[in-house]
């Protein structure tokens, strides 16, 4: 058995052992989320891939969407959800004093907003 099948089988066992009914994967357009979502799709179990742009370069969003569409065409167990989070991020940012708006804090806030969105799904 090749490595990708071993990982995919392990993921399927994890889903079963934890009594879960689907994988939920945030897809950014990068290699990590592409590999993870593909391995999860290979299980044959339900997978929801989620695109969550926040003031994102359209090219980066398109990489993610193209990957999701490829996954959906190759594997019938894939659902795609796109949630535009820019307005949610801006509203949150408006409620935080501007003195805390440094680049690192804002980048971490984007990541945490995406994380909590995935938990809601």
PLM feature segments, named:
Residues 1-121:
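ATP-dependent adenylation/nucleotidyltransferase module used to activate substrates
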